[in-house]
């Protein structure tokens, strides 16, 4: 049985939890995307499981995660975390 995995971008991989939390908060993602970011980036919950929690399609989560990753990476860089 295959299990879904969370793949963090290299630039976010080495961040401490507190840095990740700060980058997510400072990225101003909005309520839903902030929740998705926390579940995906901090809790390491696979996209399919996040989709089930929200009652959305996995593809919707996938599109949002791409945007979230871009914003969080950019914010982490501005905060000199990366």
Regions found by a protein language model. Give the residues of each.
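Short, Lys/Arg-enriched N-terminal segment that forms or immediately precedes the first helix
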Residues: 9-26
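Short helix-to-turn junction characteristic of helix-turn-helix DNA-binding domains
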Residues: 28, 39-44
């Amino acid at each position: 049985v295959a299990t879904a995995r969370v793949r963090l971008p290299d630039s976010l991989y080495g961040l401490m939890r507190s840095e990740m939390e700060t980058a997510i908060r400072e990225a101003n993602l909005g309520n839903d995307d902030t929740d998705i970011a926390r579940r995906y980036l901090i809790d390491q919950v696979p996209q399919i499981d996040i989709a089930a929690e929200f009652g959305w399609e996995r593809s919707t989560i996938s599109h949002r995660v791409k945007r979230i990753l871009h914003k969080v990476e950019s914010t982490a860089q501005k905060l000199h975390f990366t």
